[in-house]
């Protein structure tokens, strides 16, 4: 019995010492009637919202939201997202706008990126629209400090890799 306890303690210590080791939770977008699923780190502050999910990194330098949108209303959804960013004191520098096609796990859409600033300094901001069905799509809202983006690059890659349409 003492040998088993030692092994359990050794394993627990090893797991606790692993850098970046975090359990993650999957969310369906929206819930119910899912068209997509995304997995977010457990150590991020995640909240289910009316049309999806939003999450902020544990160091509070990165914000992501994944929401369902009606494709016929996508212009309104983008405008609403920009208004929401402004309500969070995020200022977008429209002169830095870059737009391009993007494909995430078979979903091809459009991404618009800007430089901006918030109360903490410079930020990177993007809005991405991904059609999933003939009538519904996802809008991804992203805002992060340049340093936060670097520090959370692995988690951000994992989030993007996890975003998949529900078939």
Q: Language-model segments: what does each one mean?
A:
Residues 1-10:
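Bacterial N-terminal signal peptides that target proteins for export
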Residues 9-19:
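Bacterial N-terminal signal peptides
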Residues 11, 23-30, 59-60, 98, ...:
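Low-complexity, Gly/Pro
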Residues 17, 64-67, 166-167:
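Alpha-helical membrane-embedding segments
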Residues 25-50:
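N-terminal "mature-domain start" segment
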Residues 35, 71-79, 146-157:
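Soluble non-cytosolic domains of exported or imported proteins
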Residues 42-44, 138-167:
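Surface-exposed amphipathic alpha-helical segments
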Residues 49-139, 144:
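Conserved polar/disulfide-associated segments of primarily extracytoplasmic proteins
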